[in-house]
């Protein structure tokens, strides 16, 4: 199975679980502003249960809302994640500070690792709403705070 097939399968399995409300993640290096998140579903896949995830995984689906003028702050993920922009326009610069713009209906694929530090910003007038699928290594957080890259320093 491909990772994409695995992710879709995990998304479907996680979507069947009971919703749990979580608050916004705290950021230390470059704090988020105007961001809230609701966990729609989550589960843990034990090591050895699925051959395509031999180490196991924490699977979580979250609805993330970024208010107009809000930002996630600079961060990265320890594994590739997938998102769907349900509403609004997300400006998404990476470590090279070149913004990529995602509009409603578009899919975001974010590679994992510190080298893929990025931020999400809402420069529009309506909230950005994202549905994000995380398939994370056991014990890893959904995101890791990061310093803004040199190109983003004022």
Kindly give the residue locations of the regions a language model identified.
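A short, N-terminal "cap"/entry segment at the start of jelly-roll beta-barrel domains
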Residues: 2-11, 15-58, 146-154
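Extended, low-polarity transmembrane helix blocks
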Residues: 29, 126-130, 136-137, 141-154
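A short beta-loop-beta micro-motif enriched in histidine and acidic residues
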Residues: 54-57, 70-84
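Extracytoplasmic
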Residues: 56-61, 125-128
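Short acidic-glycine-tyrosine-enriched beta hairpin
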Residues: 66-67, 94-115
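Short histidine-centered beta-strand/loop micro-motifs
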Residues: 72-77, 94, 101, 119-122
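Glycine- and acidic-residue-biased ligand/ion/polar-headgroup-sensing regions
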Residues: 77-97, 106-107
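Ligand-binding loop in jelly-roll beta-barrel domains
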Residues: 98, 113-140
